Each structure stands twice: as C-alpha cells, then as structure tokens.
Amino acid sequence: MAETIGSEVSSMSDKSAKIFVAGHRGLVGSAIVRKLQEQGFTNLVLKTHAELDLTRQADVESFFSQEKPVYVILAAAKVGGIHANNTYPADFIGVNLQIQTNVIHSAYEHGVKKLLFLGSSCIYPKFAPQPIPESALLTASLEPTNEWYAIAKIAGIKTCQAYRIQHGWDAISGMPTNLYGPNDNFHPENSHVLPALMRRFHEAKVNGAEEVVVWGTGSPLREFLHVDDLADACVFLLDRYSGLEHVNIGSGQEVTIRELAELVKEVVGFEGKLGWDCTKPDGTPRKLMDSSKLASLGWTPKVSLRDGLSQTYDWYLKNVCNR
C-alpha cells in the first residue's frame, strides 16, 4: 500500500475518542499519557499488569471486546540490559512476541481504527551505516547482546506491515533512539548511560567525592531524545502518518559521551574532577538514527539536551532520592 502523509490523514480531531495506552507506567507510556492529556484527550484507557496481563491471549481478547478502543499505542514491552538479555533470552523474545501478537491481533479483530507500535533502535544491524536509515532494517547481523529483544521488535514491525498488506488495516510503527526523562531507570546496576551518569554525579556530590571516573575515552558519539519529545512525535504520527514503512524517531543531534558527562556534571552541580578509565571499552564509535523522514512530515524535537537534563534531574531529586 502507498504511504499517506500530511493533513489529509489527520484522524485525531475527536478528543473524546477512546485511546488504549499499553505500558502506561513505563518511561515511554507515562510520557505519552501526559502528552495526550496535555492535548485535551479525555478518554484514556490505562491498565496495570495486575489488571491486564498482555501475555494472556484470552484476557486481551476480552479486554478489547469490552472496551473497544478507537486508537492503540503499544508501548508495553519486557526490557532490560545486556546481562538480563543474556540470562533470560526466552523471556525477552517470548514475552515480547506474546504481547505484540495478542494486542495487534485483538486490536484488528475488534475494530480499532489505528495502532502505533513502538520499537527500538536496536532493531538495526550492529554495523549499520551512520546515520541509520529505515532501509537498513534486516540488511546485516544484529548486535548479539540484545538480539532476542531486537528480533521480537522486528517481528512487531513485520506484524503491523502484514496486517496492513492483507487487511488494509492502519497499523504503523515508530522506532525511537536513546531516550531519557522522567520515570527513567536509575538503578545502579542496570541503567543506561545517561541516568547512570546522573546518579553517579549526584551521589558523588552528596558524599563529597573528589572525582567521578567514567569508562572509556569519552569519544563515542550518541544521540538522545527527551521522552516528552518522543511522546509528541507519537501523537503526531498517530494523527498524520499512514504508511507501510516504520519511522525513525530521533533528535538528529549527536553528543560525545565526554560532552554528555560534562553537561550532566554541570546540571547536577558536582564540582569535583571528571576522570576517564581508558582501559575500559568504548563500545560502538557512533550511533545516530536518520530521522529525515519524520522531519519531512513536519515534526521536529523541542527539548534541548541541557533543558531536558535539568528537568530530569529535578524529577530524580523528587522521585528517586526521596523514596
């Protein structure tokens, strides 16, 4: 099917339309709920895992039969770091496939008008061209450390495409870059680089440490997008995009790990020294998504990295430190 873009596919003018946000308690889902409420949507359906286990097909069927949402945003997923992916591969591929298959099929069967499936930049090959275009999908081998999760997410994209091709159903997919913001994971053992840096600098500041040492040289380039920008992009795509191909969602702005660390250090107010352990690995030299397709649709990010870090640190102080 041909792609359709622009105002002619604008579909979310009814602010009372019922919208099911799957995974509303996570980093992504909670931001999407905030954005929808901010834009005046009043009929959001939100279910905790205890209320609705998305891996149970019969329960998901029953939910859609009773609630009959008009739109679905699928932000629910089993996520984790390298250690978790290596230790529980069956969980990462199995649980995510179950969630996706159950929600996508039930949404179609029960007349959902449109579904947005959210994936991850890890769907792309380990040695993808930089910046990574949507067309890089399935062109080479994945990063082995998270291939179980990545394969499940690729299957989600392909499931949406299959329902569009066979049934003409409006299911679309968005692939976010590295995200950060309120409700991020700040756990010392399994958080990603940005929240990990924020926690380390904060604890060093509180404890009066003289130095924070970061792994590597600080030279790798990374891209970060504030989760509120992602949420804005999701609502934009749900409203304005209808196409077979998935859409990259990124900031388009690169920063070295060294620059990021300096910025986090400044935002947190740590006045000690920043050191680098160059005996430790740097990881991939560059990872940037090509988000020109999304830009051509008329969407651009609004939150600068500095402002986003300040907002995230404020949230961290109020919600993590005070627990």
From Swiss-Prot:
Highest taxon in the source lineage:
Eukaryota
UniProt GO molecular function:
GDP-L-fucose synthase activity; isomerase activity
Q: Where is this site: Lowers pKa of active site Tyr?
A: K153
EC number(s) recorded for this UniProt protein:
1.1.1.271
Alphabetized, the UniProt keywords read:
Acetylation, Isomerase, Multifunctional enzyme, NADP, Oxidoreductase
Name positions with the PTM N-acetylalanine: A2
Signal recorded as keyword: no
UniProt pathway annotation: Nucleotide-sugar biosynthesis; GDP-L-fucose biosynthesis via de novo pathway; GDP-L-fucose from GDP-alpha-D-mannose: step 2/2
HAMAP family in the cross-refs? GDP_fucose_synth
As for what it does, the entry says: Catalyzes the two-step NADP-dependent conversion of GDP-4-dehydro-6-deoxy-D-mannose to GDP-fucose, involving an epimerase and a reductase reaction. Not involved in the synthesis of GDP-L-galactose from GDP-D-mannose.
Name of this chain's protein: GDP-L-fucose synthase 1
